[in-house]
């Protein structure tokens, strides 16, 4: 089966999550992704949060499927020679080292262009070069804090909160992926590669654009009507935290369902749509609200919004969350059960769609991983296991023209 990136070679000089999430997607699209790792050590996530002693951790295996792994010591002359040959044949190189790290290896962008002017160089950093935080080490939650997500997440009477979703890491990888694919198309027109940089702060900010929208509205109005603080609370000079409110002009909230006392996920998310208010009133047994001036418009409802959700919860708390969603869907009400990761891992529909995939690695055995979120009509990504450390070192070196004796010598010299 033909794949979109068949024939594209990618050098994966990344670790942890932001870079590997990008290169894994390239591999799913058919690129030959060669993960370059330190001899005997490898990506740090191979060893982090292990559930089986001395076996690659799920942290690694779920971010590096479909790749090949080589061990290469770029501090040695032989290692640098191999790296230069790899660059000469590659289409894309991706790195997410601390600023300046790859330059210190001797592979500046200028030098890379001399070796291979068609190469696309993807780079992930915590902050843009013009940021005062450019030299700050960035991880997931650092990016969420600096990108506007933490300050706008949580409840108004509590501290900023970070999201469990990887807004700083995997989200940055997906943003870089888009840039790399655009650069590939641009190369078709110009014949030349280019550098594509992605900061984690920018990636988080791109998902917080509605909060930047709200900041400008707040500056002009002094209040934000769709936030729970309106009309009885107070607004400061920055966008506040809104709890579980919808934030998009459609009020929403998390509501309890039957069993909430013992099940931490016995909840649904319920959204009130202006155009569907009549159906909402019918669904919750409050038809009188349809014509009541105190409830008939979104503006009129906002002062009573918590009373409205409390009334809806009187119904939802009596039934199972799945029953609640099934019932409310009949009235075209946007809602969903709060699904635990246990429920997601066992959901047969997610297995059928390929969103959750079971793969097998030689030492670990079978494990679940997240599959490709995009569904294509012309091809289906074949999700394979992550590589063992250095599993493909010899094969890749042979492809570069090295003999068995030369490979053995490099091993002896600790270059591989």
Curated annotation (Swiss-Prot):
<keyword id="KW-0808">Transferase</keyword>
<feature type="binding site">
    <location>
        <position position="38"/>
    </location>
    <ligand>
        <name>CoA</name>
    </ligand>
</feature>
<dbReference type="InterPro" id="IPR023606">
    <property type="entry name" value="CoA-Trfase_III_dom_1_sf"/>
</dbReference>
<dbReference type="Pfam" id="PF02515">
    <property type="entry name" value="CoA_transf_3"/>
</dbReference>
<comment type="similarity">
    <text>Belongs to the CoA-transferase III family. Frc subfamily.</text>
</comment>
<feature type="binding site">
    <location>
        <begin position="72"/>
        <end position="75"/>
    </location>
    <ligand>
        <name>CoA</name>
    </ligand>
</feature>
<feature type="active site" description="Nucleophile">
    <location>
        <position position="169"/>
    </location>
</feature>
<feature type="binding site">
    <location>
        <begin position="248"/>
        <end position="250"/>
    </location>
    <ligand>
        <name>substrate</name>
    </ligand>
</feature>
<protein>
    <recommendedName>
        <fullName>Formyl-CoA:oxalate CoA-transferase</fullName>
        <ecNumber>2.8.3.16</ecNumber>
    </recommendedName>
</protein>
<dbReference type="GO" id="GO:0033608">
    <property type="term" value="F:formyl-CoA transferase activity"/>
</dbReference>
<dbReference type="GO" id="GO:0033611">
    <property type="term" value="P:oxalate catabolic process"/>
</dbReference>
<comment type="pathway">
    <text>Metabolic intermediate degradation; oxalate degradation; CO(2) and formate from oxalate: step 1/2.</text>
</comment>
<dbReference type="InterPro" id="IPR050483">
    <property type="entry name" value="CoA-transferase_III_domain"/>
</dbReference>
<dbReference type="InterPro" id="IPR003673">
    <property type="entry name" value="CoA-Trfase_fam_III"/>
</dbReference>
<feature type="binding site">
    <location>
        <begin position="273"/>
        <end position="275"/>
    </location>
    <ligand>
        <name>CoA</name>
    </ligand>
</feature>
<feature type="binding site">
    <location>
        <begin position="96"/>
        <end position="98"/>
    </location>
    <ligand>
        <name>CoA</name>
    </ligand>
</feature>
<comment type="function">
    <text>Involved in the catabolism of oxalate and in the adapatation to low pH via the induction of the oxalate-dependent acid tolerance response (ATR). Catalyzes the transfer of the CoA moiety from formyl-CoA to oxalate.</text>
</comment>
<comment type="subunit">
    <text>Homodimer.</text>
</comment>
<feature type="binding site">
    <location>
        <begin position="137"/>
        <end position="140"/>
    </location>
    <ligand>
        <name>CoA</name>
    </ligand>
</feature>
<feature type="binding site">
    <location>
        <begin position="17"/>
        <end position="18"/>
    </location>
    <ligand>
        <name>CoA</name>
    </ligand>
</feature>
<dbReference type="InterPro" id="IPR044855">
    <property type="entry name" value="CoA-Trfase_III_dom3_sf"/>
</dbReference>
<feature type="binding site">
    <location>
        <position position="104"/>
    </location>
    <ligand>
        <name>CoA</name>
    </ligand>
</feature>
<dbReference type="InterPro" id="IPR017659">
    <property type="entry name" value="Formyl_CoA_transfer"/>
</dbReference>
């Amino acid at each position: 089966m033909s794949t979109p990136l068949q024939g594209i070679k990618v050098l994966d000089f990344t670790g942890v999550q932001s870079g590997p999430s990008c290169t894994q997607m390239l591999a799913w699209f058919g690129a030959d992704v060669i993960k370059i790792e330190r001899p005997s050590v490898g990506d740090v996530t191979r060893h982090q949060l292990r559930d089986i002693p001395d076996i690659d951790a799920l942290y690694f295996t779920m971010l590096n499927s479909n790749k090949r792994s080589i061990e290469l010591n770029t501090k040695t002359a032989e290692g640098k020679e191999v790296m230069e040959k790899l660059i000469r044949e590659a289409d894309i190189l991706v790195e997410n080292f601390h600023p300046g790290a790859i330059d210190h290896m001797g592979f500046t962008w200028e030098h890379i262009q001399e070796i291979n002017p068609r190469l696309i160089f993807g780079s992930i950093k915590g902050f843009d070069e013009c940021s005062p935080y450019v030299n700050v080490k960035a991880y997931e939650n650092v990016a969420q804090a600096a990108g506007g997500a933490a300050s706008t997440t949580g409840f108004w009477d509590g501290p900023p909160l970070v999201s469990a979703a990887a807004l700083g890491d995997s989200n940055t990888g997906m943003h870089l992926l888009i840039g790399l694919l655009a650069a590939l198309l641009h190369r078709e027109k110009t014949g030349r590669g280019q550098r594509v940089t992605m900061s984690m702060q920018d990636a988080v900010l791109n998902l917080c654009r509605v909060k930047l929208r709200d900041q400008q509205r707040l500056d002009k109005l002094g209040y934000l009507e769709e936030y729970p603080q309106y009309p009885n609370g107070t607004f400061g000079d920055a966008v506040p935290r809104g709890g579980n409110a919808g934030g998009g002009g459609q009020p929403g909230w998390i509501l309890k369902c039957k069993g909430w006392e013992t099940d931490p996920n016995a909840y649904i998310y319920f959204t009130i749509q202006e155009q569907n208010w009549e159906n909402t009133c019918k669904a919750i047994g409050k038809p009188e609200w349809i014509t009541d001036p105190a409830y008939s418009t979104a503006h009129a409802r906002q002062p009573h919004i918590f009373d409205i959700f409390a009334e809806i919860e009187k119904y939802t708390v009596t039934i199972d969350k799945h029953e609640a969603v099934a019932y409310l869907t009949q009235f075209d009400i946007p809602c969903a059960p709060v699904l635990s990761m246990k429920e997601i891992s066992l959901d047969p529909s997610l297995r059928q769609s390929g969103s959750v995939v079971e793969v097998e690695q030689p030492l670990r055995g079978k494990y679940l991983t997240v599959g490709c979120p995009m569904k294509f009509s012309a091809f289906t990504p074949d999700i394979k296991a992550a590589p063992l450390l250095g599993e493909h070192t010899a094969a890749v070196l042979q492809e570069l023209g090295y003999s068995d004796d030369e490979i053995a010598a490099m091993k002896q010299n600790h270059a591989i």
